[in-house]
Swiss-Prot record:
It holds the Pfam family GHMP_kinases_C. Catalyzes the phosphorylation of the position 2 hydroxy group of 4-diphosphocytidyl-2C-methyl-D-erythritol. GO terms for molecular function: 4-(cytidine 5'-diphospho)-2-C-methyl-D-erythritol kinase activity; ATP binding. The gene is ispE. Its EC number is 2.7.1.148. This is 4-diphosphocytidyl-2-C-methyl-D-erythritol kinase. The lineage of its organism: Bacteria, Pseudomonadati, Pseudomonadota, Betaproteobacteria, Burkholderiales. It comes from Ralstonia pickettii (strain 12J).
Length: 289
C-alpha cells in the first residue's frame, strides 16, 4: 500500500441527470435493460472520511430512515475491506443535500465517492475498473459515478461509453414526493420495448438534450400528480423539460447559469428548485486510474 492521508474532507458526491432513459428489454432475472445518457451536475452531497486504525466502519451522521448498516456508504466500505483484506476502518460523516427517491442517484453517488475516497485513504491504489466492478454489487448506477465522466450507458446501466456533452446549466425541481423505484419498474403500463439507440445517433451532441424521452415518466406522472404538475410548470420556460431516473426530480437544460438561475428563482415554494451546472468529470476522478 502506498502512503496515504489519514483524513479526507469535503469529498463531493455529485448528482446525475438522465438526459433520456429508454427501457429496451428485460433480462431473464427481471432486471430491465436500459439505454441512457448520464450527465453529472454540481449539486452534491458532501462526505468526510477519517481513517481508523481498527477495522470498524462508523457512520457518524444520523440519517432519518436509513440505518447505518444498511447505508450504501457502509456497505461500500465493507465490500472494499472484503475485496482487499484492508485492516483499516473509517469514520464517515455525510452532509446530505440530495433528496432520496429523487432520481438523482444520491445514494449511489455517496457509495461511489466512498469507494474512490477509501481507495486513496486506505492506500489501496485499485484500478478504476476494479472499483466499478465492486460498485456494481451495490447498485446499477454506482459504476457510472466511479467511471467519473458523462457517459452513454447500456445494459442495466453498467456498460459505459464516454460522451462529450455541450456546456449547459440545468433547473432541477424536486416536487417533494418520494418515488420508490420498484413501484415504477413493476407497473404494467411501463414501456419495455423502445427501439435501440446507437451512440452515432448524436453526431451533433447538442441534439442529446432533445433526444428520446424518459420511458419511466408516464408511469411516474400517473402515480404522482405532483411530478406532472412540476413538468407543466417547467415547460413554460423550456419544451425540453423531463424527469430524471424513476423520479421524482424533473429538469430542463438552459444555455447559461444566469438564465437557469432566473428560472430556478421562480420555482413555487412548495417545491425545491435548484440551478445546477453540468460537469464533465467527477471531482474525485483522479482517485483512481
Amino acid at each position: 500500500m502506498s502512503s496515504a492521508p489519514v483524513e479526507l474532507r469535503d469529498c463531493p458526491a455529485p448528482a446525475k441527470l438522465n438526459l433520456f432513459l429508454h427501457v429496451v428489454g428485460r433480462r431473464p432475472d427481471g432486471y430491465h435493460l436500459l439505454q441512457t445518457v448520464f450527465q453529472l451536475i454540481d449539486w452534491s452531497d458532501t462526505l468526510h472520511f477519517a481513517r481508523r486504525p481498527d477495522r470498524r466502519l462508523v457512520r457518524t451522521t444520523d440519517i432519518l430512515g436509513v440505518p447505518a448498516d444498511d447505508d450504501l456508504v457502509i456497505r461500500a466500505a465493507r465490500l472494499l475491506q472484503a475485496e482487499t483484506g484492508c485492516t483499516y476502518g473509517v469514520d464517515i460523516a455525510i452532509e446530505k443535500r440530495l433528496p432520496m427517491g429523487g432520481g438523482l442517484g444520491g445514494g449511489s453517488s455517496d457509495a461511489a465517492t466512498t469507494l474512490l475516497a477509501l481507495n486513496r485513504l486506505w492506500g489501496l491504489d485499485l484500478p478504476r475498473a476494479q472499483l466499478m466492478k465492486i460498485g456494481l454489487k451495490l447498485g446499477a448506477d454506482v459504476p457510472f459515478f466511479v467511471f467519473g465522466q458523462n457517459a452513454f450507458a447500456e445494459g442495466i446501466g453498467e456498460k459505459l461509453t464516454p460522451i462529450t456533452l455541450p456546456p449547459a446549466a440545468f433547473v432541477v425541481i424536486h416536487p417533494r414526493v418520494h418515488v420508490p423505484t420498484p413501484a415504477i419498474f413493476s407497473d404494467e403500463g411501463l414501456t419495455r420495448d423502445t427501439p435501440l439507440t446507437i451512440i452515432t445517433d448524436f453526431p451533433d451532441q447538442q441534439i442529446v438534450f432533445a433526444y428520446g424521452r424518459n420511458d419511466l415518466q408516464a408511469v411516474a406522472e400517473r402515480k404522482y400528480g405532483e411530478i406532472a404538475r412540476a413538468l407543466v410548470w417547467l415547460r413554460q420556460f423550456s419544451p425540453l423539460a423531463r424527469m430524471t431516473g424513476s423520479g421524482a426530480c424533473v429538469f430542463a437544460p438552459f444555455d447559461n447559469v444566469e438564465h437557469a438561475q432566473a428560472v430556478a428563482d421562480q420555482v413555487p415554494s412548495e417545491w425545491e428548485g435548484r440551478c445546477a451546472a453540468g460537469l464533465t468529470h467527477h471531482p474525485l476522478a483522479r482517485f483512481a486510474v
